[in-house]
């Protein structure tokens, strides 16, 4: 699942001849447009004046290694971005005597999620900076001496770029915790795909017979601290986004002496990219539906403080091969946690989809909206908006090229669709639409209906649901939160730090008010005070770290049997199999809960009225909801984490 960048010898090796009429149609200069049967494309004024024109590759390349953050802003992109021809690569690799080469990624038929982690080779780790804006880099597209005729052929995905390892064998723990024995619970089946860091297999859960995908990441290939941190962060982000219907779900992470095993949902419907290839382009109605899904994931990510940084059709998989199959976002290997107004400088992504501010090394989550805009353009027309024969040429077009709305099929596409694409591909990120604004655009709305009000941020939504729970359930969630691994709550920890402005370990009313405002929540002070009091279980007047985690925890954590049993066991002090009023009173005292109204809590949960709570009654309370003032539905459509309200 992955297609790599093609180097300067692209014309000589015949790759450009393997284009398809349905996809990536080459555009020509203005002087040739009249004689073309397709009438394809406009080029920038600079490109039109040059004697030779750029040709487009037959499909977008895989993410590439881009310039380091220390590159002189005045230096052109080409020296950092140009990929050596194969024979030159081998010569370079031979000279690196102490380095290993990770095998190239191969094409796979139905990859549930590739281990195709793109690596930014640079002296510094990929950390955001808040320095003054650097000067834009200048690039010149390369030109060919002649335009070769196109021939119809099945497009082949180029092989992944080779990754040259540094040195050394890493033996310490990657997950930083002891895990259960993977082989006791799962057996591996056929190979689904090969990535840079590991291999993806079909995976069978022994206890249930359920099928999953398992990405086994070889520890010996994690040769730098950055490699290890990338793996940890990817797992953390997948846990953080868990529960969204269009994000691939993670079942668990395991580690043994040789590998990290990441067990995930199995998606067997193939890539969005492949369906675009088959169709040429989508109808507007279907394209709008897919755009809603893609941008909906973005809105969810951004509200949870996550920037994807590598959106492209290859990173979306269908659950099945059915026409109306659910679409899932995969591969968070380049994703990062971010804070409001944080500036990132490391250049990562894929050439056709990278935002101009990323190339200028000063960007934030707005760059994801640009990438989504490129995908929408491709869904509607079958070709990318900015293209050239070389990577350098692509970047020049991204920075300065003009959008083409004159070539087929754009004359037959609605003005509303064109308006959305224009607003998503504004080069100034401050003027670009946000993910939520895209969802409110008339072309994307469901049956022409926009949300009545801005979507609640994930933090606000979860706190609202938490505030509606009775104190017994709040305490149980606190127990579950304290039992979770660091990787499962790392995202919430980042959000707590963002709101806790003075780093006191306590969130005050003013800090909560400011934090909710930063993520787009517009609440009255009385409403914020209600949320504050609901989360402040021990009535201390502030929200401490553990209270915040419990109040913002996604309720999918309740579905796990081990979490439920651990919480029940905490209250069942004498291990009798029942929770008595005295045991519940003791727990309230431990949590500092005053005015607990023990009898009322018992009455709400004790279904058989025997004066005690058994395990089944406890599970029913946790899963169905037992809330002061009425029942609450806890399906995906009402999950207040990151589901979208229509």
Curated annotation (Swiss-Prot):
> Which Gene Ontology MF annotations are present?
ATP binding; calcium ion binding; protein serine kinase activity; protein serine/threonine kinase activity
Main location per UniProt?
endoplasmic reticulum
Enzyme Commission code: 2.7.11.1
The family database entries (SMART domains) matched by this protein are listed as:
EFh (SM00054), S_TKc (SM00220)
Q: Where is this region: Autoinhibitory domain?
A: 450-480
Q: Which organism is it from?
A: Arabidopsis thaliana
Q: Which UniProt keywords apply?
A: ATP-binding, Calcium, Endoplasmic reticulum, Kinase, Lipoprotein, Membrane, Metal-binding, Myristate, Nucleotide-binding, Palmitate, Phosphoprotein, Repeat, Serine/threonine-protein kinase, Transferase
- Source domain of life is Eukaryota
Q: Which cysteines are joined by disulfide bonds?
A: none
Recorded protein name is Calcium-dependent protein kinase 2
The free-text function statement in the UniProt record for this protein reads:
May play a role in signal transduction pathways that involve calcium as a second messenger.
| Lipid sites, type N-myristoyl glycine | 2
Q: Where is this region: Disordered?
A: 27-169
Specify the Protein kinase domain's residue ranges.
186-444
Q: Where in the cell is it found?
A: Endoplasmic reticulum membrane
Residues annotated to bind Ca(2+) 3: 572, 574, 576, 583
Catalysed reactions listed for this entry: L-seryl-[protein] + ATP = O-phospho-L-seryl-[protein] + ADP + H(+); L-threonyl-[protein] + ATP = O-phospho-L-threonyl-[protein] + ADP + H(+)
Q: Which residues carry this modification: Phosphoserine?
A: 350
Q: Which residues bind Ca(2+) 1?
A: 500, 502, 504, 506, 511
């Amino acid at each position: 699942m992955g297609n790599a960048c093609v180097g300067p010898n692209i014309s000589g090796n015949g790759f450009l001849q393997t284009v398809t009429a349905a996809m990536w149609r080459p555009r020509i200069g203005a002087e040739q447009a009249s004689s073309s049967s397709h009438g394809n494309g406009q080029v920038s004024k600079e490109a039109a004046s040059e004697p030779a024109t750029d040709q487009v590759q037959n499909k977008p390349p895989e993410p590439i290694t881009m310039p380091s953050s220390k590159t002189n802003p005045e230096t052109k992109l080409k020296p950092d971005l140009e990929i050596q021809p194969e024979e030159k690569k081998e010569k370079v690799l031979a000279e690196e005597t102490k380095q290993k080469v990770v095998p190239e990624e191969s094409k796979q038929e139905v990859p549930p999620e590739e281990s195709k982690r793109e690596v930014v080779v640079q002296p510094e780790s990929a950390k955001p900076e808040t320095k003054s804006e650097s000067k834009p880099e200048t690039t010149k597209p390369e030109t060919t001496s002649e335009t070769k005729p196109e021939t119809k052929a099945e497009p082949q995905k180029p092989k992944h770029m080779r990754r040259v390892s540094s040195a050394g064998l890493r033996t310490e723990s990657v997950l930083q915790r002891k895990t259960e024995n993977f082989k006791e619970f799962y057996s591996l089946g056929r190979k689904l795909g090969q990535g840079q860091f590991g291999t993806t297999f079909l995976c069978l859960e022994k206890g249930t017979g359920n099928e999953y995908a398992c990405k086994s990441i070889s520890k010996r290939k994690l040769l730098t601290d950055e490699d290890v941190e990338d793996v940890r962060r990817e797992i953390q982000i997948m846990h953080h986004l868990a529960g969204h219907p269009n994000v691939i779900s993670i079942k668990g992470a395991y580690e043994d002496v040789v590998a990290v095993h990441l067990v995930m949902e199995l998606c067997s419907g193939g890539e969005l990219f492949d369906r675009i290839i088959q169709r040429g382009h989508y109808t507007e109605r279907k394209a709008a539906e897919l755009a809603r899904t893609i941008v909906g994931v973005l809105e969810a990510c951004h509200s949870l403080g996550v920037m994807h940084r590598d959106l492209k059709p290859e990173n979306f998989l269908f659950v099945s091969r059915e026409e109306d199959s659910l679409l899932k976002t995969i591969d968070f290997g380049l994703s990062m946690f971010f804070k409001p107004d944080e500036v990132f400088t490391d250049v990562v992504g894929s050439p056709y989809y990278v935002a101009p501010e990323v190339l200028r090394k000063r960007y934030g989550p707005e760059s994801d909206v640009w990438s989504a805009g490129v995908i929408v353009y491709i869904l509607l027309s079958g070709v990318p908006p900015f293209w050239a024969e070389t990577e350098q040429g692509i970047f020049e077009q991204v920075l300065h090229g003009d959008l083409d709305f004159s070539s087929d099929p754009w004359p037959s596409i609605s003005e509303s669709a064109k308006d959305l694409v224009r607003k998503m591909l504004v080069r100034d990120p401050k003027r670009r639409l946000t993910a939520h604004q895209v969802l409110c655009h008339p072309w994307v709305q469901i049956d022409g209906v926009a949300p009545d009000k801005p979507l609640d941020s994930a933090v606000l939504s979860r706190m609202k649901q938490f505030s509606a729970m009775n104190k017994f359930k709040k305490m149980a969630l606190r127990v579950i939160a304290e039992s979770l691994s660091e990787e499962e709550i790392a995202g919430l920890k980042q959000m707590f730090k963002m709101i806790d402005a003075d780093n006191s370990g306590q969130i005050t009313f003013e800090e909560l008010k400011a934090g909710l405002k930063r993520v787009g929540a517009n609440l009255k002070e009385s409403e914020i005070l209600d949320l504050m009091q609901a989360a402040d279980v021990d009535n201390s007047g502030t929200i401490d770290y553990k209270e915040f985690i419990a109040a913002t925890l996604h309720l999918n954590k309740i579905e796990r049997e081990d979490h439920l049993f651990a919480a029940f066991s905490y209250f069942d002090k004498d291990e009798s199999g029942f929770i008595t009023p005295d045991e519940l009173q003791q727990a309230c005292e431990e949590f500092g809960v005053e005015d607990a109204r023990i009898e009322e809590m018992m009455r709400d949960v004790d279904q058989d009225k025997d004066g005690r709570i058994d395990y089944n009654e406890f599970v029913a309370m946790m899963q169905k909801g037992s809330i002061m003032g009425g029942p609450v539905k806890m399906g995906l459509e009402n999950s207040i984490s990151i589901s979208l309200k229509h």
